[in-house]
Amino acid sequence: DTQSMKDIKRSVTALASLHKTMKMPVQTHYVKEPLLMEYERKNRELRKIRKFVCQKRRKNDFELRYLDSISCYLWHAEEAQRRLNCSGYEDLRCRSLESGDVCHGEYNQHNVLILAQNTAVINFDRWHYDIQMEDLYQFMRKILEKHNWDLEMGRQMLLAYHEEKPLNVQELENLRIRFAYPEKYWKLANYYYSHSKAWISEKNLEKLE
């Protein structure tokens, strides 16, 4: 239940416990693309979409709003990339791979079963090797989006994880950078560019406001 703080904390504790045990010898095929490369790629895509929209003679409402907002969001995206590059990311990633850290890959409320006595995690189809902060970030973001980015809720989730699996300074910085990147904005722009560029739903228009 995403409205129950008790269930949310149990889910985070279960993730931390899972992360302590999910370690295997690295198989190169399952190593995820480095986050630095991912941000570089996504930022190129944002610039490419901006160029495409600028060159259109007739622009719909979505495209006009996109052009109004892209400078701000692209700045945040490039700043997150710069911060990641200047952080201890490479060292953190190397240590994660050396210890064989495994991520669930899709840790959200749909894949956590809150039982009477225990908590079960299901659907490991998207598992891979990476910094395990990825899982924590994905889960926290999904929950916080549903609660209007409640800072106290975010703090409690972090504490619940930290109590089970202590977070170091590099992991906390990595988590901060992930939250700083405008992921939802990139997804919206990428969806527009990859699908019909002529028809835009009202829902997507609202997301740009």
Give residue spans per PLM region.
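ATP-binding pocket architecture of kinase catalytic cores
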Residues: D1-V31
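Gram-positive cell-envelope targeting signals
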Residues: A16-H19, R58, Y73, C94, ...
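ATP-dependent phospho-/nucleotidyl transfer catalytic cores
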Residues: H29-V102, K207
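Helical subdomain adjoining the active site within ATP-dependent kinase catalytic cores
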Residues: Q55-N60, Y191-E209
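Active-site acidic catalytic loop and adjacent metal/ATP-binding pocket
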Residues: R83-E134
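Active-site activation/catalytic loop segments of kinase-like enzymes and analogous catalytic loops
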Residues: M133-P166, F179-A198
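Helix N-cap / loop-to-helix initiation motif
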Residues: L167-E171
